[in-house]
Amino acid sequence: MNLVLASTSPRRKELLTHIGLGRAEFSFSQVAPDIDETPKAGELPRDYVQRLAAEKALAGLALCSGMSQPAVLGSDTIVVLENEILGKPVDEADAKRVLRALSGKAHTVMTAVALAKADQTSVRLVETLVRFCVLSDADIDAYVASQEPMDKAGSYGIQGLGGCFVESIEGSYSCVVGLPLVETRELLSEAGIR
């Protein structure tokens, strides 16, 4: 079986590498699927993130048509505050707006991971509660000026400078980074990939 990561995210690549525990025989390739990430009318955040992960895995599988027995991992992460999905910021003003909204509050990070093979697609959903400290305008301005939040759901990266804003988490740290390790290992194990 040939493992493929349907993502070009350096964070997901690094996390998937960790799953191999340094074994030389654990390897994977990457593809960049292109899907429409527009939420459907009335779609709940849990349903949305699971749908996107599955669609990414299936789109990645379609890109592997010449490969022998591909197994494709797709993943998607969203930040949810008061039932609103906070995606990647469209610009610096949007990033600042999102960070102000998160300031001093708890929000949920949802990451879904899907494994698609020729005959089936399996999906796991992981949710982690993240609590932010109160952020000053100066903190927000400096963080956005670093450009770190610009490609991240919820406008922050817990594994980088944005970790300074995290007061506590309840749940999976790797979920917040973008690929829940325990659940991904379970999916791979069930597919016979070790």
From Swiss-Prot:
* Any one GO molecular-function label of the UniProt entry: UTP diphosphatase activity
What is the E.C. number? 3.6.1.9
Active site positions, chain numbering? 76 (proton acceptor)
One biological-process term from Gene Ontology?
A: nucleotide metabolic process
User: Carries keyword Metal-binding?
Assistant: no
| Main localisation | cytoplasm
User: Which cofactors are reported in the record for this sequence?
Assistant: a divalent metal cation
Q: What class of enzyme is it?
A: hydrolase
Keywords assigned by UniProt?
Cytoplasm, Hydrolase, Nucleotide metabolism
Source organism superkingdom: Bacteria
Q: Where in the cell is it found?
A: Cytoplasm
Gene3D superfamilies, alphabetized = 3.90.950.10
Indicate whether Calcium appears among the record's keywords: no
Known catalysed reaction(s)? dTTP + H2O = dTMP + diphosphate + H(+); UTP + H2O = UMP + diphosphate + H(+)
Transmembrane segments annotated in the record for this chain: none
Q: Pfam families attached here?
A: Maf (PF02545)
Q: Gene Ontology terms, cellular component aspect?
A: cytoplasm
| Site feature: Important for substrate specificity | 11, 77, 159
Task performed by this protein: Nucleoside triphosphate pyrophosphatase that hydrolyzes dTTP and UTP. May have a dual role in cell division arrest and in preventing the incorporation of modified nucleotides into cellular nucleic acids.
Member of which family?
Belongs to the Maf family. YhdE subfamily.
Identify this protein by name: dTTP/UTP pyrophosphatase
Q: Which organism is it from?
A: Shewanella sp. (strain MR-7)
Q: What is the lineage of its organism?
A: Bacteria, Pseudomonadati, Pseudomonadota, Gammaproteobacteria, Alteromonadales
